[in-house]
Amino acid sequence: MATTERAVRDTATDTLVEKSRDADVVSGGHLVAKALKAEGVDTIFTLCGGHIIDIYDGCLDEGIRIVDVRHEQTAAHAADGYARQTGKLGCVVTTAGPGCTNAVTGVATAFRSESPILHIGGQSSLTQHKMGSLQDLPHVDMMTPITKFASGVFSTERVADMVSMAARECFNGQYGPSYLEIPRDVLDREIPISEARIPKPGSYRSSVKSIGDPADIEKLADMLVNAKRPAVLLGQQVWASQGHNEAINFVRSLDIPAYM
């Protein structure tokens, strides 16, 4: 209990103090940026909000481009489009309350389209939890049905670790979005960098791709051979498995129309 009370007291005061210039300490927002950079993210799509301001400071320091749009739905769709076109992790960052709810349609689209995007959302401070604070909503509960992974982060020491975990889930098995809620005081708080858990990039992500069921492949071949006017509809899995060149050769060899 004493440890919990001390942590809450620390987050409350750390939000108000001027940020340190000591290279041996790091804020939660800067840990977000470091973790995103380790995941290969070079751009975030966002609409500026007070709950997430320290993430922007971290992104500037890490050389991550900030695309500030006029509505969070645009930011979510942009992150989705970025992921589809590049094959990399798309990232949308929203403030608490309406910032999160405005992004729901874009995240739901990514979920149904199997697009790997990471949605990072702000939240009111832990010290104001369940007190009806500014723009306080149950974001995790709302995002759970339309994401593969949805969680809150309640410790600055775990920020980078949780960002990496959420990013991993975007690419684990069937691709899709993840949601991570980070309270304002967790982002603002500074800790010794030695206490932060920062996973090494690429050391934990699955790289194994399973092959299709041979029986299904045989069935598909029979359908194509016997079809009078065949056409092929290619899904997101073609991009996810990096099989686009094979798909192109396939439809060209059969000389049939294809749609992606």
Mark where each language-model region is.
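N-terminal alpha/beta PP-like core and its mobile active-site loop of ThDP/TPP-dependent enzymes
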Residues: 2-260
